[in-house]
């Protein structure tokens, strides 16, 4: 079983066992214990610090998603992003997240996020849809950042 499949199973298990918020926190701990994931997070952290001014605080938005079995529930991503954008603007800090699809990327761009790193994830483990495939090319993901004054203070 690949680490991606293990990761997805672990995420589903933790979210059903602990609820989405605590499940995401537990998942982050699970992720950071894996050596390959540590390198993944290290590379993203390095890029964040290249872009943002030295010492700038930021909120890391992790595991934003929607339950596909309830398509009638709308606006949850908007509520999350608007709440954290307001908090970040008041505190003069940034928001950071990763988009794992073109659709997610376009949603985040609508809310003012910009892409600062494009990377492949899951090469040799999953295909472009995230399905297990030992010859898979992985999928494209995007490190995205937001700050109310990004155009003047971020270093592209």
UniProtKB/Swiss-Prot annotation:
Q: What is its main location?
A: membrane
Which regions span the lipid bilayer? Answer: 20-42
Q: What is this protein's record name?
A: Putative increased recombination centers protein 11
Q: What gene name is listed for this protein? A: IRC11
Coiled-coil positions: none
Q: What happens when the gene is disrupted?
A: Displays increased levels of spontaneous RAD52 foci in proliferating diploid cells.
The family database entries (PANTHER family) matched by this protein are listed as: ACETYLTRANSFERASE (PTHR43451:SF1), ACETYLTRANSFERASE (GNAT) FAMILY PROTEIN (PTHR43451)
Q: Does the keyword Membrane apply?
A: yes
Can you say where in the cell this protein is located?
Membrane
* Biological-process GO terms, alphabetical: mitotic recombination
Membrane topology label: Single-pass membrane protein
Q: What else is known?
A: Partially overlaps YOR012W. Disruption phenotypes caused by deletion of this gene may also be a result of a defect in its overlapping gene.
Transmembrane recorded as keyword:
yes
Swiss-Prot/TrEMBL keywords: Membrane, Transmembrane, Transmembrane helix
GO cellular component terms listed in the entry, alphabetical order: membrane
Enumerate the InterPro entries for this protein: N-acetyltrans/Recomb-assoc
Q: Which organism is it from?
A: Saccharomyces cerevisiae (strain ATCC 204508 / S288c) (Baker's yeast)
């Amino acid at each position: 079983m690949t680490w991606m499949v293990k990761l997805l199973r672990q995420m589903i298990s933790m979210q059903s066992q602990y609820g989405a918020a605590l499940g995401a926190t537990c998942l982050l701990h699970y992720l950071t214990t894996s050596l390959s994931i540590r390198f993944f997070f290290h590379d993203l952290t390095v890029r964040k610090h290249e872009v943002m001014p030295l010492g700038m605080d930021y909120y890391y938005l992790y595991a934003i998603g929607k339950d596909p079995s309830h398509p009638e529930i709308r606006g949850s991503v908007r509520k999350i992003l608007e709440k954290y954008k307001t908090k970040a603007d008041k505190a003069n800090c940034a928001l950071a997240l990763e988009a794992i699809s073109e659709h997610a990327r376009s949603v985040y761009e609508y809310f003012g996020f910009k892409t600062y790193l494009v990377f492949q994830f899951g090469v040799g483990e999953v295909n472009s849809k995230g399905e297990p495939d030992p010859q898979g090319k992985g999928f494209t993901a995007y490190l995205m950042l937001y700050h109310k004054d990004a155009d003047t203070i971020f270093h592209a």
